[in-house]
């Protein structure tokens, strides 16, 4: 694999008032990939690639691609208020690794298609507002961020797993699209003693199976509070339904649907200072709400608890 990359950055000096600033970044990358399966050194007691060469077109590839990306951000800075707008667009490519290509020899199907590079075109538009409201007591900082995006894929690489085995199988989905809206709001209050963040994601996905176990909706709430030697943190989240595929030998693909769920995490830290040294005692609990959803007998969101002690002299 070889390639070349270059980046051009343009920065404006701002307007006469020194409030508006504009940055433009342009990047270009050329990639060249060449794979040769006949140069592999394989152990014939495990598998002999020469015996399956007539069944599977594997590992002999010569790919190249040009990648362009451009992003621009315009920001306005004023006392107590900063606003930024950005637009990013471009294309990208993901070449199949040899390991991903090897997965296709799991089933010697002469009709299966060779694994092709994944190509993507993307567009994102967003805004960020950061303010320090003087008129609101005990509110140190407020931040709001919103963005919309669209990703178009050609030959989207999808991974599935063999039932009961941690073996990934890769294939291409000819066309796939994902677009959506992402919102995030943050607040710092009482001199940084309490902070909170809420995030909302809503996606429009053309084919849920092309994005295995990807939720089309997600809501998260994070809070952190500090008092004396104690730090308390909590994370609450809710996700929508998820869809994935399981590969069953001699039967093909089975679609798996996981229901929507919600759960929460807790984190507590106590600072220790004994004069001759200092440290922390921390407790972390993840997925504390009981959830019995399992896949092939394996709990997917099992409860986990950690107790950690650190001390430094």
Positions of PLM-derived features:
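Short loop/turn motifs that connect adjacent beta-strands in outer-membrane beta-barrel proteins
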Residues: 10-22, 75-83, 132-142, 190-193, ...
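Residues that define the transmembrane beta-barrel architecture of outer-membrane proteins
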Residues: 1-2, 20, 62-68, 119-123, ...
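Signature of Gram-negative outer-membrane beta-barrel scaffolds
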Residues: 1-81
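Residues on the lipid-exposed face of transmembrane beta-strands in outer-membrane beta-barrel proteins
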Residues: 4-12, 70-76, 125-129, 181-187, ...
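Membrane-embedded beta-barrel scaffold of Gram-negative outer-membrane proteins
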Residues: 77-79, 84-96, 100, 117-179, ...
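C-terminal beta-signal and adjacent terminal beta-strands/loops
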Residues: 93-94, 155, 230, 238-247, ...
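Gram-negative outer-membrane beta-barrel transporters
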Residues: 31, 137-157, 167-247, 289
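Transmembrane beta-strands of outer-membrane beta-barrel proteins
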Residues: 20-26, 68-70, 83-87, 140-146, ...
